[in-house]
Amino acid sequence: MKLSEIHMRDPFILPYEGVYYLYGTRSFHDTGFDVYTSTDLVTWSEPHSVFEKSPDFWGTIDFWAPEVHVYKGKFYMFATFINDHTNRGTAILVADSPMGPFRPHSDGAVTPKEWMCLDGTFHLDEDGQPWMVFCHEWVQIQDGTVCAIKLSDDLHHASSEPIELWKASDAPCVRHLGWNDEAFVTDGPFIFRHDGKLMSLWASFDETGYIEVMACSDNGRIDGNWSVDYPALLTGCDSGHGMLFTTFDGKRKFTCHHPNCDPDERPVLYSVDGLTFTKD
């Protein structure tokens, strides 16, 4: 398969032992996750199921944005879920292989239970402290925020109160949603380092549609002061919710979904030079 044949939102690529593993949201209404594999980023396998909803699993809809991170010899999936009786939130699943099967690890969502949250991602700081960085959703607070919370060493639960890193309207390139002039969106944070600086990708909207945006911590730490005073990295192409990874020959790549409309979303790849993205 080619990437253009894969219907997916929120793509995430894990390079591991010579194989690239591609995870993402199947659709808004599906209740499971797949992985696609490749050795060259061009030809991909057929989908292989890594997680399917069981009768006793707490999430019932909105199976969104799976990310898989290697930590202490295990593979941890951060993914978003909701049901009729709880708020949307990011939970953590675990597996012994990037091919799954993944099983529930956290006791429900790790994000605050009283908040509507999504798109949790993993960060391990220089002190070895694990964090989840996530979005407090605009549907609850209008001006969406990106927040962070410390995790227990075993990634089973949160071990601190959340801290707010920035809000969507702080970014000069972000515009409110067209049908709601008080709604500003934060989606898909992804933490990375560039030239020694701790930075984050995230997604929102401007007058052209979905965009990819950037933030930077002033002290190289999650709990620093974050600036979002940057132009959009991607605008005018209705693309976003991206992440960075390094190929096996040492090149940095970016992937996101394009366009941002169902059912046309496909994962796309960009080559990265500094903070300049060029579509492959």
Regions inferred by a protein language model and the residue ranges of each:
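Carbohydrate-active catalytic/glycan-binding domains of CAZyme proteins
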Residues: 1-280
